[in-house]
Amino acid sequence: MSGDSKRSIEIYDTTLRDGSQLEGISLTVEDKLRIAEQLDSLGVHYIEGGWPGANPKDDEFFERAKEELSLETSVFVAFGSTRRAKGKVDQDQTLANLLGANTEVVCIVGKCWDYHVREALQTSLEEGVAMVADSIEYLVANGRRVFFDAEHFFDGYKNNPEFSLQVLEAAAMAGAERLILCDTNGGTLPHEVEQAVGDVVEHLDVGVGVHLHNDAGCGVANAIAGVKAGAIQVQGTINGYGERTGNCDLVAVIANLTLKMGYETIPEDCLSRLTPVSHHVAELVNLTLNPQQPYSGSSAFAHKAGLHTSAISRRPDAYEHVDPEIIGNGTRFVVSEMAGRSTLELKANDLGIDLDGKVLGDVVEVLKRLEYEGYHFEVADASLELLMRGASGWKQDFFEVERFSVDMNHVGSGSRAWNEISVEVDTRAVVDLFVDGKKMVGLGDGNGPVNAIDTALRSVLTGSYPELKAISLVDYKVRVLDTEKGTGAVTRVLLDSTNGEANWTTIGVSENIIEASWQALIDSLVYGLLHSPHRDMPQSE
């Protein structure tokens, strides 16, 4: 570690503005308020709320934030731009909106690349500098702390370093507390960031920050390079959300700077919030978190090969670069055809299932055979648990299915894509089963076979197991495993289910898609009943 390794690095989150520019994200005001609460619980230093005056949504957000947000650790920031070219600061609506937001800190963006000043603003370089200086001076005079986002700094510094430094000098002289060097196009490489940041830190006696995009895949690496060169603030977003390919991921930045380089970032007792906040924000922006997301992804500390899991059972640090519990994640053992006895034994132990001796070896062989047939248990933990419990001697006694049938009535002809005649499909399922020794018949109508079968099962089972009312199917995935066989190919079905508190995935494989769906559905209901809070978990025999 370097001699300054314990200096504090400010974490500035711009998920609510820059992060929301990612394709596919559209935040409501309520979403933004909830995300701000999550960021505050994480202990970031600054939360950029958005651009007041830019749209009605941001205006409402800033108004509600004044009344509804009680931040304990974070400082709220309003974002905007410099005055217009040839304009006056006291007549500029953007600056007026910034003051109207009533935040302690404002962050304004200004051009730092001569090419943009001439071509985008279509004004002189002298006026470009004046726009920055005048705006900062005006905001400071009105009692605001000002951060200056030097837009396109790294590209500008390559092209005309004298002008880029002149803009920064003017911003510092006008009273900016932080000079944020922005890689707006995201194409700068780490060695270039380190050199440029080092030059600015040496040249100016004002705190320097970095704002990195990920277009070259270097967002996090560039943040680290900037800090090494003397930057004291990193701007980024949770999970790296942002326009185009995103911004630098603050989850990885915080973890790397804190755990690997010894810098102080967020409060130490907040590090365990990194993974929960990462997942919570993903839910709020309505995007599935990448399982391979560094540090916070569900696969970040997952181990599939038997050799790895065998070593981890003895020495966790053998195949894990940090202790996952520090950042709120955990070790996960994935069972697949690559897994050996040690992987399966660790998985069983986690679930409280005794699979010692010959039984363990038999289960390993069964799993390998099933995976060869098309099962994929590493993404279907619920079905895997039921299989292992069955091998240990447990038998599910919630219900016993005798038979089921599905009828479909199709009215109309042809494809809806080209046929103007309306097409109607009615589906009915009949299920014969035993509950508590009594034979019962369930009937169910639905918009498809799976829905109809689910309805038929519930029509009988809910009377004995009212907890099924809380269980719902949230996703249904079908994959054809051998496309060369056409309509006769083997199909794999994955069902995602929830009871409102936990989620689980089950699997079915068959040449018949309805049979594959049936397998996954039965596993889903059995697993949900098994893990009902009203029921004790079974013990291995």
Feature roles, as predicted:
Residues 185-188, 195-314:
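Catalytic alpha/beta core domains of metabolic enzymes, predominantly
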Residues 464-498:
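Generic long, charged, amphipathic alpha-helical segments
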Residues 5-9, 15, 255, 261-436, ...:
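A mid-to-C-terminal "edge-of-domain" accessory segment
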Residues 343, 445-463, 512-528:
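Stable alpha-helical structural segments in soluble proteins, enriched in small hydrophobic residues
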Residues 9-11, 17, 21-47, 62-71, ...:
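Alpha/beta enzyme core
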Residues 72-79:
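A glycine-rich helix N-cap at a beta->alpha junction
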Residues 500-538:
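Mixed-charge, glycine-accented linear interaction segment located at domain edges/termini
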Residues 181, 236-243, 258-267, 327-333, ...:
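Short beta-alpha connecting loops at secondary-structure transitions
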